[in-house]
């Protein structure tokens, strides 16, 4: 679960390497985000010449969490790191590539472009 002040790795080539969560979107007083939820972040570490710069405030969707998520069939899926993909207002990714696997739960959130760019969907 991702909450305020959580640092996440960025799993795309938008130029950001690490972001810090400012707010979890979706309802008043919502405290935590899981896979497929949208968060507002600030860029803490970025590569030179990237689309996003250090200090930019961006929206991102969570694609991997250490705490994992329970599926309808009773199975759990967990990852080794917390990671997100920076998105535009139309839910499309800012970058052109996605690194690492993403969870199948992103299909339900209408993030089909991210799912299609990902090398592996678990």
Swiss-Prot record:
Any single Gene Ontology cellular-component annotation: cytosolic large ribosomal subunit
Gene Ontology biological process terms, A to Z: translation
SUPFAM superfamilies for the chain: Ribosomal protein L14
Keywords: Ribonucleoprotein, Ribosomal protein, RNA-binding, rRNA-binding
Highest taxon, organism lineage: Bacteria
Disulfide bonding pattern of the chain: none
InterPro entries, alphabetized: Ribosomal_uL14, Ribosomal_uL14_bac-type, Ribosomal_uL14_CS, Ribosomal_uL14_sf
MF (Gene Ontology): large ribosomal subunit rRNA binding; structural constituent of ribosome
SMART domains reported for this sequence: Ribosomal_L14
NCBIfam families xref list: rplN_bact (TIGR01067)
Primary role: Binds to 23S rRNA. Forms part of two intersubunit bridges in the 70S ribosome.
Assembly notes: Part of the 50S ribosomal subunit. Forms a cluster with proteins L3 and L19. In the 70S ribosome, L14 and L19 interact and together make contacts with the 16S rRNA in bridges B5 and B8.
Similarity-based family: Belongs to the universal ribosomal protein uL14 family.
Protein's name according to its UniProt entry: Large ribosomal subunit protein uL14
């Amino acid at each position: 679960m991702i909450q305020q002040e959580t640092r996440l790795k960025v799993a795309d080539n938008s130029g950001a390497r690490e972001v810090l969560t400012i707010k979890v979107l979706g309802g008043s007083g919502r405290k935590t985000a899981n896979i497929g939820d949208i968060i507002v972040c600030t860029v803490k570490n970025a590569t030179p010449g990237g689309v996003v710069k250090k200090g930019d405030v961006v929206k991102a969707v969570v694609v991997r969490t250490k705490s994992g998520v329970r599926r309808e069939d009773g199975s759990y899926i967990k990852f080794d790191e917390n990671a997100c993909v920076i998105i535009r207002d139309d839910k499309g990714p800012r970058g052109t590539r996605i690194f690492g696997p993403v969870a199948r739960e992103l299909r339900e959130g209408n993030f089909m472009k991210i799912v299609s760019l990902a090398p592996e969907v678990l």
